[in-house]
């Protein structure tokens, strides 16, 4: 640690600062950027107006970012606490950090990671996730060796060690992500366990989990903060899957007067859940809530919500469930919360929170509790009479979903829920430029919260800068694309930019492995064919448009060439293939590619339909994995 940070600081204080730093550093990259500061103030529920938060963050960056690289390192963080301690700004900052609750340092002596951040984990989360997983996998014969787990011990951290539970949870969140035939379930040697963990991590990445800083060895060792972080992402993706208008048209009942369907579609799942809870609270005559933390601590809003959504027995075959409101008047908060959870239990929804989690206002677990309520009992009716353009609700294409998952897996902030709406201020695109080694001058970038007046102008300036970077340092082909197109959310032109980002990212990985040799389509095709023929395989490909790719045989053979003997050819169909055969081959190929360690984002359908862009990424990822053999 350098001079500037060592002025009179005790070991205890240093440990506390490390823990605080880890709480703010959301993507665990060892630095705090202004997005993470915004998230911190948002989560801390501090009663500050937007402009005040902007001022505080600007001042923190000004005083704290001493080497002016646009982010705060751990040493700079210590400096803020040491030197700027007395200022109001630093006091507010400390207060915000202290409000992120529920932290339990590991046995008092936390492990320090290479970045010097302290890792702590939340007992409450462990307890909640264990109960959720026990219920989800109670009838799965492949998990009998670990389920049920005891929520009061460290069972969970041991249970994830062979990768099976993780693979199963991924499939529950996004069905069919992993081909069950690719999960090793017997004779679990260290090598076979490593493969399962590769499969789990690469599949988690493909559904949009941020796993950049998690390795298979971390999961095998059951590192609590990493296990809980990954599980929360997987569980959340499953909980949020249907909180989306194209998958759940009844959500249109939440439209407010004068609001268009397009505006409603831009809301994140969290915002929709809040809107849903308030819709029912309004109908019950109770006041609105603004969050799932401070505003639900007394359980009173929950009582009303349960009472509204409980089935009234009016539909055929639907038993009536009565919510007993007597606990509402209980004077003790914890007892009131317990009484409320007993009512939730009648609906089969006593999940994720204990009475203490409700009373402490744990934001993550309360969000999960409400999402589960929504999934079981939405209690919404699709509006029939209104003038609604239902054609807008087409849902995202496979390609859009793949791009979105790829971005989220790289840990962009904010999380991308809607490809076009969430890129309209270009912040995510600018972060992706950094991931492909195109330097971004963050002092030129406008950041949220944007001022009420002129917000769109600020976003447009970012979009113009994003297009400028694409044309010059990145040398993308952006003919006819302007910042306005990104700002308007023009699908075709936004996709053109995003595809070039993903392509460059994929090729960079290859160039890093090949000591900087340029990679392009021809080089990949030649490598694929050479590798296949050297392994004595009869398949080959002409290009990424080659129709024979639809059988997936070239992909399967290439995987077997890279890791000889890993493919079970009894499971692979050849000859005259039906659509089903092709799909089964593709599903097996994608899962096996992930199992041998290739981070494949494409979907089986991309191979069956021979989508050249996605086919290119599959072969490029496999080439990357093949080059690591040397």
UniProtKB/Swiss-Prot annotation:
Role played: Actin-bundling protein.
Quaternary structure, from the entry: Monomer.
Any one Gene Ontology BP term: actin filament network formation
Region (Actin-binding 2) location: 383-627
Ranges of residues in domain EF-hand: 12-47, 52-87
Positions that bind Ca(2+) 1: 25, 27, 29, 31, 36
Taxonomic lineage of the native organism: Eukaryota, Metazoa, Chordata, Craniata, Vertebrata
SUPFAM superfamilies: Calponin-homology domain, CH-domain, EF-hand
Binding site for Ca(2+) 2: 65, 67, 69, 71, 76
Residue numbers bearing the Phosphoserine modification: 268, 293, 326, 339
Designated name of the protein: Plastin-3
Domain Calponin-homology (CH): from-to ranges: 123-239, 267-378, 397-506, 518-627
Compartments reported by the entry: Cytoplasm
Modified residues (Phosphothreonine): 391
Pfam families: CH (PF00307), EF-hand_7 (PF13499)
Region (Actin-binding 1): 109-382
A GO MF label: calcium ion binding
PANTHER family assigned: FIMBRIN/PLASTIN (PTHR19961), PLASTIN-3 (PTHR19961:SF32)
GO cellular component: actin filament; actin filament bundle; cytoplasm
Superkingdom per UniProt: Eukaryota
Keywords: Actin-binding, Calcium, Cytoplasm, Metal-binding, Phosphoprotein, Repeat
Main location: cytoplasm
InterPro entries: Actinin_actin-bd_CS, CH_dom, CH_dom_sf, EF-hand-dom_pair, EF_Hand_1_Ca_BS, EF_hand_dom, Fimbrin/Plastin
């Amino acid at each position: 640690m350098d001079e500037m940070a060592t002025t009179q600081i005790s070991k205890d204080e240093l440990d506390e600062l490390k823990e605080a730093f880890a709480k703010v550093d959301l993507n665990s990259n060892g630095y705090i950027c202004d997005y993470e500061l915004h998230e911190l103030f948002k989560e801390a529920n501090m009663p500050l107006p937007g402009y005040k938060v902007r001022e505080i963050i600007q001042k923190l960056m000004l005083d704290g970012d001493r080497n002016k690289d646009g982010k705060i390192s751990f040493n700079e963080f210590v400096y803020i606490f040491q030197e700027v301690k007395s200022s109001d700004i630093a006091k507010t900052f400390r207060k915000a950090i202290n409000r992120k609750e529920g932290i339990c340092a590991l046995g008092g002596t936390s492990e320090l990671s290479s970045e010097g951040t302290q890792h702590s984990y939340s007992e409450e989360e462990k307890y909640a996730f264990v109960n959720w997983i026990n219920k989800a996998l109670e009838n799965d014969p492949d998990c009998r060796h670990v389920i049920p787990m005891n929520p009061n011990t460290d069972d969970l951290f041991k249970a994830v060690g062979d990768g099976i539970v993780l693979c199963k949870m991924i499939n529950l969140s996004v069905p069919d992500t992993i081909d069950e035939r690719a999960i090793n379930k017997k004779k679990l040697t260290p090598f076979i366990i490593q493969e399962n963990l590769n499969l789990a991590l690469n599949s988690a990445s493909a559904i949009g989990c941020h796993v950049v800083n998690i390795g298979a060895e971390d999961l095998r060792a059951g590192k609590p903060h990493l296990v809980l972080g990954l599980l929360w992402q997987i569980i959340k993706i499953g909980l949020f899957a249907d909180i989306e208008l194209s998958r759940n048209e009844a959500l249109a009942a939440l439209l407010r007067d004068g609001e268009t369907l397009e505006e409603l579609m831009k809301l994140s799942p969290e915002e929709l859940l809040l809107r849903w809870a308030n819709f029912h609270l309004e109908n019950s005559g109770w006041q609105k809530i603004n969050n799932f933390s401070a505003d639900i601590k007394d359980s009173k809003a929950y009582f009303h919500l349960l009472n509204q959504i409980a089935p009234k027995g009016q539909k055929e075959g639907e038993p009536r469930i009565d919510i007993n409101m007597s606990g509402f008047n209980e004077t003790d908060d914890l007892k009131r919360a317990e009484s409320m959870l007993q009512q939730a239990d009648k609906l089969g929804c006593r999940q994720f929170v204990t009475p203490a989690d409700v009373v402490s206002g744990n934001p993550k677990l309360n969000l999960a509790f409400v999402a589960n309520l929504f999934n079981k009992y939405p209690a919404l009716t699709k509006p029939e009479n209104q003038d609604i353009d239902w054609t807008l609700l087409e849902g995202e294409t496979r390609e859009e979903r793949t791009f979105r998952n790829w971005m989220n897996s790289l840990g962009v902030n904010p999380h991308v829920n809607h490809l076009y709406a969430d890129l309209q201020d270009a912040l995510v695109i600018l972060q992706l430029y950094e991931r492909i080694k195109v330097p971004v001058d963050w002092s030129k970038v406008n950041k949220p919260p944007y001022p009420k007046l002129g917000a769109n102008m600020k976003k447009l300036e970012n979009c113009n800068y994003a297009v400028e970077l694409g044309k010059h340092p990145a040398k993308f082909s952006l003919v006819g694309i302007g910042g306005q197109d990104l700002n308007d959310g023009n699908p075709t032109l936004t996709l053109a930019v995003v595809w070039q980002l993903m392509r460059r990212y994929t090729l960079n990985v290859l160039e890093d492995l090949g000591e900087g040799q340029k990679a392009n389509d021809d080089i990949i095709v030649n490598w694929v064919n050479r590798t296949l023929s050297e392994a004595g395989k009869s398949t080959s490909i002409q290009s990424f448009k080659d129709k024979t790719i639809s059988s997936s045989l070239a992909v399967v053979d290439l995987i077997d060439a890279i890791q000889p003997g890993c493919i079970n050819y009894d499971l692979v169909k050849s000859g005259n293939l039906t659509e089903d055969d092709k799909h089964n081959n593709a599903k097996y190929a994608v899962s096996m590619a992930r199992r041998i360690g290739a981070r494949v984002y494409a979907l089986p359908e991309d191979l069956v339909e021979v989508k050249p862009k996605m086919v290119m990424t599959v072969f490029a990822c496999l080439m990357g994995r093949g080059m690591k053999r040397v």
